[in-house]
Amino acid sequence: MDSRVLESALRALSRYPLCDRCLGRLFARLGRGWSNRERGEAVKRVLVMELHRRVLEGDEAALKTLVSAAPNIGEVARDVVEHLSPGSYREGGPCAVCGGRLESVIASAVEEGYRLLRAYDIERFVVGVRLERGVAMAEEEVKLAAGAGYGESIKAEIRREVGKLLVSRGGVTVDFDSPEATLMVEFPGGGVDIQVNSLLYKARYWKLARNISQAYWPTPEGPRYFSVEQALWPVLKLTGGERLVVHAAGREDVDARMLGSGRPMIVEVKSPRRRRIPLEELEAAANAGGKGLVRFRFETAAKRAEVALYKEETARVRKVYRALVAVEGGVSEVDVEGLRRALEGAVIMQRTPSRVLHRRPDILRRRRLYSLDCSPLEGAPLMECILEAEGGLYIKELVSGDGGRTRPSFAEVLGREAVCIELDVVWVEHEAPAAPG
């Protein structure tokens, strides 16, 4: 036999029963526009024809080969074997690779997959496959027996065939660059589940009142504070998502307002069932949830890679604060000028504040105070300060000194106790770069 394709096919079929798809997959890179089922069917027919020719030309070994391989070749060999050697044909077992399940699993995966895509409002998807180890091992054994070098994996075939048939139903397309979901097909079990990618939105929030936390803070009696996350729950309801996560460019204290530029964030909705909601509608829902205490602006869709960029790029960016500071014994113009000269442009050495030591490691931070402008308030031992600082500088501790854990501090420079009694964030330097691609 002088055909490498037929030689490879015969080596495999002499040892293993193979369905048309699993045989044809050994030669998946030969020919164009054919399915593996068509390849396998064609190879089987030509192989039977070639062996039949050799028998007719007096090759007795060819008859033995044909009769021996016929159960593994299948129904296409029955009539020829029965004609050449009546009563010799024997039924073979199921396919050694897929167990005869491949066709039915592909068909059922398309049905269930399409239902899931529609249920989750998915237009762009990819297909993944979870393959039992025994199937992968059987496939490798057949490849070794055949010795063919033009095949593909059963995973690749399932991904392609399921994807192609789903696209043919309309309304969905395979998108490897930015899929909205992944359909996972189990083989040979046949189960299908969907991994829905989160919705991600660039947005900003403003906290217009104090005692509002950024994250939801549950207690047995209910939320400890109203939160930015809680205000966004109407967005979760609107999108039909399972959970909402706020990825903000830093955070302010619960008792601090966020004013001015607002704080940049990415809003993530996990496992949404409705994806194509206009930004204006999402923003309106969020602002309704904010109850006049928190305001939002939704800007554009975001990419997953930008979540990390928001956190990385904003960890030490500049921020501007307004602080109302009480000073023991009052404060004068001389005091505020002395503060400015001592602290403006200084690098502040700051150990983790004692108030957060229970949840953060005790480390030494070096953060710069870029500018400081304080004004005494008449009739009270108070001053109002506008500070521009490097991100990560704890302003309350910059004022109080935190028992010497922050140096220099307002209290150290003034030589008496100083306390920040109000704090507002009025500007956050931010334009996180777009993620690659």
From Swiss-Prot:
Enzyme Commission number: 5.4.99.25
Keywords, alphabetical: Isomerase, RNA-binding, tRNA processing
Active site: 253
Top-level EC class as recorded in UniProt: isomerase
UniProt cross-references to SUPFAM superfamilies, sorted A to Z: Pseudouridine synthase (SSF55120)
Gene Ontology biological process: tRNA pseudouridine synthesis
THUMP domain: residues covered: 76-198
One Pfam family in the UniProt entry: Pus10_THUMP_arc
One GO MF term attached to the UniProt entry: tRNA binding
Residues where substrate binds: 321, 394
Catalysed reactions, as listed in the record: uridine(54) in tRNA = pseudouridine(54) in tRNA; uridine(55) in tRNA = pseudouridine(55) in tRNA
InterPro entries the record matches: PsdUridine_synth_cat_dom_sf, Pus10, Pus10-like, Pus10-like_C, Pus10_THUMP_arc, THUMP_dom
Similarity annotation: Belongs to the pseudouridine synthase Pus10 family.
Cited function: Responsible for synthesis of pseudouridine from uracil-54 and uracil-55 in the psi GC loop of transfer RNAs.
Protein name per its UniProtKB record: tRNA pseudouridine synthase Pus10
Organism listed in the record: Aeropyrum pernix (strain ATCC 700893 / DSM 11879 / JCM 9820 / NBRC 100138 / K1)
Lineage: Archaea, Thermoproteota, Thermoprotei, Desulfurococcales, Desulfurococcaceae
